[in-house]
Amino acid sequence: MRLDKFLKVSRLIKRRTLAKEIADQGRIIVNGNKAKAATNIAVGDELKIQFGQKLLTIEIDALKETVKKDEASELYTIKQEEYIKAE
């Protein structure tokens, strides 16, 4: 599954176009490598996503094409959530 599609389906990012913009800015890392929106991801991959001053590290638990809002958080596990100080 494409990275941008997963981020939208899992509701980590609201829109697929926004996920693409964030990836193009280099704010998403998959298994230690900067990722593009079209990067293929798999179950067990580790994602680091920077939202402003928050760095979220998650592990992918499942991949589904569509999911109900209540079940979206079952697609991933949050491993770490940290805040980055502004310089």
Segments from the language model and where they lie:
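Extended boundary segments
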Residues: 1-11
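Strongly charged
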Residues: 5, 17-21, 27-87
